[in-house]
Amino acid sequence: MNAALSQWKDAHAARLRDYSAVRVSGRVSAVRGILLECKIPAAKVGDLCEVSKADGSFLLAEIVGFTQECTLLSALGAPDGIQVGAPIRPLGIAHRIGVDDSLLGCVLDGFGRPLLGDCLGAFAGPDDRRETLPVIADALPPTQRPRITNALPTGVRAIDSAILLGEGQRVGLFAGAGCGKTTLMAELARNMGCDVIVFGLIGERGRELREFLDHELDETLRRRSVLVCATSDRSSMERARAAFTATAIAEAFRARGQKVLLLLDSLTRFARAQREIGIASGEPLGRGGLPPSVYTLLPRLVERAGMSENGSITALYTVLIEQDSMNDPVADEVRSLLDGHIVLSRKLAERGHYPAIDVSASISRILSNVTGREHQRANNRLRQLLAAYKQVEMLLRLGEYQAGADPVTDCAVQLNDDINEFLRQDLREPVPLQETLDGLLRLTSRLPE
């Protein structure tokens, strides 16, 4: 009883210390796209404000900067109905979320408010009594990140044989439209055996989102998943913030000692949303037509995933590429930040080769941490066969290839159909890791020494 009373007293004492009888407010002086200008004394970057609309409703906005004359707010929704002179009430808090098991099975918007499901949502208002954490936060210090040593099988032969993932790894899934990206994501979520799955769906079409919910997520998967969605018609602030909201939710479950899978689709649309925000804020355009804030926020986002002393976040980030080109500025930047990448090939998809994973173009930087020497040697031999076949593929199509010049190339030509058969798979039928390894060893043992 005394302990409960003491806890109650400490909680209310903290509230009283923060309480002020003076209510600071401001008024809108200008509206420039998603940016609102006003004057608010003692404001801080990152604080949320409520802006009154003409119809009596409120719009959330976040303080993003200052000039000598005014405070700059970025509207967290469409600024329709905002008038010059509209009252602004600072909430005195940054964007925070509260996370507990009630979120499992819920669909949230980019800020953590419920869209579907009987739940309170994650968004924490000024009167929220839950334990909360900030959406925009720093990553764990490098000294607090354990080494990745545990393999995380996916049930997909093309991945487990050549790009075996590790618990806590951050991987990019590079794909063009129509390459089977969404289907592969859903199957990875189903097969990877994580305690909690957090989906961040950014800039998707509304129709595709509904189809994903109805057809890709069965009831078992839904019960251990949280979905954060910001469709393409939502504001640029919501689309960009959805990535951070999903990451913060994953961090909360990791802090509870759970093994979390974070699936973020896509970093390209996140970068496009941040580009809109940067241009509206007056940032200059830099490399690839992107403002500096994009290159600042990408590492700040992806570095928050990974291992901790308590749990792990294994993160899969999709990146949209055009015409199978990896030279897109976002793709190039993301590839340098992550621990590996999986490339889906349009050419393979057009041949009906699914999953359309281009093994020779995909890589895992921590493969040696989670595989033995036998597996590594077989993986190298598989890549050697694929590279040898690619060198003579055009000659084979023209009928100009002559056998006998190189035994490795001859073997690659003979084994090509067997290799493709090994890499093809019905994703609804996951393959155990040991079975995949046995098949890989049998296949590559036919390569001459």
Swiss-Prot record:
GO molecular function annotations of the record: ATP binding; ATP hydrolysis activity; protein-exporting ATPase activity; proton-transporting ATP synthase activity, rotational mechanism
Lineage top rank: taxon: Bacteria
EC number of the protein: 7.4.2.8
Gene that encodes it: sctN
Swiss-Prot/TrEMBL catalytic activity: ATP + H2O + cellular proteinSide 1 = ADP + phosphate + cellular proteinSide 2
InterPro entries hit by this protein: AAA+_ATPase, ATPase_a/bsu_AS, ATPase_alpha/beta_chains, ATPase_F1/V1/A1_a/bsu_N, ATPase_F1/V1/A1_a/bsu_nucl-bd, ATPase_T3SS_FliI/YscN, P-loop_NTPase, T3SS_ATPase_C
Name of the protein in its database record: Type 3 secretion system ATPase
NCBIfam families: fliI_yscN
Source organism (scientific name): Pseudomonas savastanoi pv. phaseolicola (Pseudomonas syringae pv. phaseolicola)
Protein purpose: ATPase component of the type III secretion system (T3SS), also called injectisome, which is used to inject bacterial effector proteins into eukaryotic host cells. Acts as a molecular motor to provide the energy that is required for the export of proteins. Required for type III secretion apparatus (T3SA) formation, proper protein secretion, host cell invasion and virulence. May play a critical role in T3SS substrate recognition, disassembly of the effector/chaperone complex and unfolding of the effector in an ATP-dependent manner prior to secretion.
SMART domains recorded: AAA
PROSITE patterns referenced in this protein's UniProt entry, alphabetically: ATPASE_ALPHA_BETA (PS00152)
A single GO cellular-component term on record: cytoplasm
Residues holding ATP: 178-183
Biological process, per Gene Ontology: protein secretion by the type III secretion system
Keyword line: ATP-binding, Cytoplasm, Nucleotide-binding, Protein transport, Translocase, Transport, Virulence
Activity regulation statement: Oligomerization increases ATPase activity.
Main location: cytoplasm
CDD domains: ATP-synt_flagellum-secretory_path_III_N, ATPase_flagellum-secretory_path_III
Subunit annotation: The core secretion machinery of the T3SS is composed of approximately 20 different proteins, including cytoplasmic components, a base, an export apparatus and a needle. This subunit is part of the cytosolic complex. Forms homododecamers. Comprises two hexameric rings that are probably stacked face-to-face by the association of their C-terminal domains. Also present as monomer and homohexamer in solution.
Protein's cellular compartments: Cytoplasm
Enzyme superclass (EC): translocase
Family membership: Belongs to the ATPase alpha/beta chains family. T3SS ATPase subfamily.
